[in-house]
Amino acid sequence: MDNVLPMDSDLFPNISTNTSESNQFVQPTWQIVLWAAAYTVIVVTSVVGNVVVIWIILAHKRMRTVTNYFLVNLAFAEACMAAFNTVVNFTYAVHNVWYYGLFYCKFHNFFPIAALFASIYSMTAVAFDRYMAIIHPLQPRLSATATKVVIFVIWVLALLLAFPQGYYSTTETMPSRVVCMIEWPEHPNRTYEKAYHICVTVLIYFLPLLVIGYAYTVVGITLWASEIPGDSSDRYHEQVSAKRKVVKMMIVVVCTFAICWLPFHVFFLLPYINPDLYLKKFIQQVYLASMWLAMSSTMYNPIIYCCLNDRFRLGFKHAFRCCPFISAGDYEGLEMKSTRYLQTQSSVYKVSRLETTISTVVGAHEEEPEEGPKATPSSLDLTSNGSSRSNSKTMTESSSFYSNMLA
């Protein structure tokens, strides 16, 4: 197929076909300037925002929770993808010439798949954690060590999935330019290439979103559709509201990811249906737009955290306190709110099955941090996102529920 826009260095599914020596995809300067400004916004916002998210969590002891460790992994993957791939993708799509050599050609085809896999499965892990915390609150939670092991396994699987595309990546020198492409093994009807691309799309988009959708649907029904007992205390209502805020924030994160990446996946599946589309000159603008939307997903999460979570908002205000239009706020609250451990007796209503479990509680907080004080063996440590530590002693009386702000 001649005159195909060479997408072979793009994130993943490539059209590994013959490319012409001429370059028909030449844009006017004003278009390049506009696209450059749009992509610059992504890189700056994503890298700065995600680095601040990582700092907020790792620099504050009480923010080191199971959920937040997965958010660190998500932020790391997105910051790296924005820093190492967005600009290169843009320059190659605009000029249709590969300037970066063989090694970076392999890395450029390899790393984004791994980063995208790590991102979506970090969201899946958070959804599973929310599901277990709210639907099965008496089940043991992941420890800090187990959480790190899960993150390590996610990256190992991500690297294995991305390996074939990096391995078969190569550069090809033409009389007028160099292109980065993927030379898949010869096979009738490009079977290996099609199988790999479909497998990748399912594993890093459709499958995890299906799992996440199921988890949050069940959690949403539990938190919003079930009635709260009329005699529940104000503290208990606050606790349920806190759970809802966490779930709502993560649903926004996942929906943003799904919307941003859908056009990109569709774009790379279309050639298997109608290959002639890649012969059209307008396809370059379609690609730049779909890639911008996909890459922009890396910059939205820090904004979502800042808008929907009080602690992250405090952290961002402190990080940007040098800006004259930003008030630093009560920065001590980032630590203080999660360090209060009050002994109280609390009623826990299991709304999913309309059962009430009455327990003695020592210290209610968002999640038990990595190195936080441990509850006594006879206590049930309930958190504002529904998490719990077992070894409980059931009581026959209830009292107010003390809930902290969310992490």
Curated annotation (Swiss-Prot):
Where is the major localization of this protein?
membrane
Where do the TM regions start and end? Answer: 32-54, 65-86, 107-128, 149-169, 195-219, 249-270, 284-308
Disulfide-bonded cysteine pairs: these are: C105-C180
Q: Where is this region: Disordered?
A: 362-407
Instruction: Fetch the Pfam families from UniProt.
Output: 7tm_1
Describe, as the record does, how this protein assembles with itself and its partners: Interacts with ARRB1.
Entry protein name: Substance-P receptor
Query: Could you tell me the gene encoding this protein?
Result: Tacr1
